[in-house]
């Protein structure tokens, strides 16, 4: 049975590749119209939009460079909001720089903060007025496993700082917007290195977590599918860790 979507419309940022691509297709299978953004010069959105269209729902792709000047990003997002009545935001954009802090630069800092935190703020700001007007909205942001408790990750000082900011932002958004029928959540994927791997394939492999297998895009997509349901209206401000029970500090390999 498909979750109740009632022809709702989702916008998945970064939907051309990686985990956001899988989430986009999963939402389409649930009956959502799914529109995506993609980075100019990056992965072509065609593969994703074709997969969405195959599910019999509406789709479109929009070029948005979330690392561009804030005014340019705002204009691009406002244009999307004018054209599409978005009920569900899945903000999948979130670049990562793996580098010990002693080697990190201000350019790395800008990329992490702008690409992860500022991008989330701008996406929410563009879509919030429409959600308020329709008295319904679901916003999903992404942290990393442990970002809700500021768990350290060697080589990811700037990334973890930005993701912890995303958690604080989403929780505050949930507090302020709940009265308008808008919920906000953070999904924290664990160490998912092969973004195209299926769950059945992952079960044949091992990993150092409580479950004993690697995570997959399907695990993350199922979490998102649950949180954006019509009848998930009593859940908000949730930080859902999809990491196979992994606890403790990361030892990220870095140059």
Residue ranges: model-predicted function:
Residues 124-125, 171:
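A short, exposed helix-loop element centered on a Lys and neighboring polar residues
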Residues 178, 183, 235-237:
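Short, small/polar-rich loop/turn modules that mediate ligand/substrate recognition or access, typified
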Residues 203, 225, 236-255:
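Short C-terminal tail/terminal secondary-structure segment
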């Amino acid at each position: 049975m498909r979750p109740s979507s009632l022809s709702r419309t989702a916008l998945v940022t970064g939907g051309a590749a990686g985990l956001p691509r899988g989430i986009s297709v999963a939402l389409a299978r649930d009956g959502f119209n799914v529109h995506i953004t993609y980075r100019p010069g990056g992965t072509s959105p065609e593969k994703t939009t074709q997969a969405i269209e195959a599910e019999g729902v509406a789709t479109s792709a929009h070029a948005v460079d979330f690392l561009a000047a804030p005014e340019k990003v705002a204009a691009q997002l406002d244009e999307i909001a004018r054209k599409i009545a978005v009920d569900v935001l899945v903000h999948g954009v979130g670049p990562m720089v793996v580098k010990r802090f002693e080697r990190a630069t201000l350019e790395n800092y800008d990329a992490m903060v702008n690409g992860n935190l500022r991008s989330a703020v701008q996406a929410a700001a563009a879509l919030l007025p429409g959600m308020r007007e329709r008295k319904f909205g679901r916003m999903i942001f992404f942290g990393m496993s442990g970002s809700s408790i500021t768990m350290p990750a060697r080589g990811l000082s700037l990334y973890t700082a930005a993701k912890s900011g995303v958690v604080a932002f989403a929780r505050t958004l949930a507090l302020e917007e709940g009265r308008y029928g808008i919920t906000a959540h953070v999904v924290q994927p664990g160490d998912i290195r092969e973004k195209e791997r299926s769950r059945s394939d992952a079960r044949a492999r091992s990993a150092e977590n409580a479950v004993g297998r690697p995570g997959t895009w399907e695990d993350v997509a199922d979490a998102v599918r649950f949180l954006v349901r019509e009848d998930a209206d009593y859940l908000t401000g949730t930080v859902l860790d999809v990491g196979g029970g992994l606890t403790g500090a990361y030892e990220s390999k870095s140059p």
